[in-house]
């Protein structure tokens, strides 16, 4: 349920709903931003992504869950560019404590 709420919020560029899912000490890692620590800093980075694109669609191909972790195989479309990747999310007490994103980024 939490994972699905995150996916919907991300697709809707709903930074307030995303914020409600993140722990204060949330850590975001991905190939672009590298490593960001803290909810506020991560939300700022996510906001920049949202503002930089007109059209964004995040589609989960498969979701794997256990007690405290989720793995999402996904396709992310940003302004007509399609990226495939995997998000590994760690949860604690109903909040996301870490998200590690692995993307197949096209070479220029």
Language-model features: where?
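A short gly/proline-enriched turn/hairpin at secondary-structure junctions
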Residues: 27-37
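Short, well-ordered alpha-helical segments enriched in acidic and aromatic residues
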Residues: 2, 12-25
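Amphipathic alpha-helical repeat scaffolds
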Residues: 4-8
């Amino acid at each position: 349920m939490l994972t699905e709420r995150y996916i919907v919020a991300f697709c809707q560029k709903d930074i307030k709903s995303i914020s409600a899912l993140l722990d204060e000490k949330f850590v975001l890692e991905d190939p672009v931003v590298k490593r960001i620590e803290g909810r506020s800093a991560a939300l700022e980075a996510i906001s920049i992504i949202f503002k930089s694109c007109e059209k964004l669609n995040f589609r989960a191909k498969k979701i794997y869950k256990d007690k405290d972790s989720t793995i999402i195989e996904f396709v992310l479309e940003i302004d007509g560019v399609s990226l495939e990747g995997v998000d590994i999310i760690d949860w604690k007490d109903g909040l996301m404590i870490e998200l590690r994103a692995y993307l197949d980024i096209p070479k220029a």
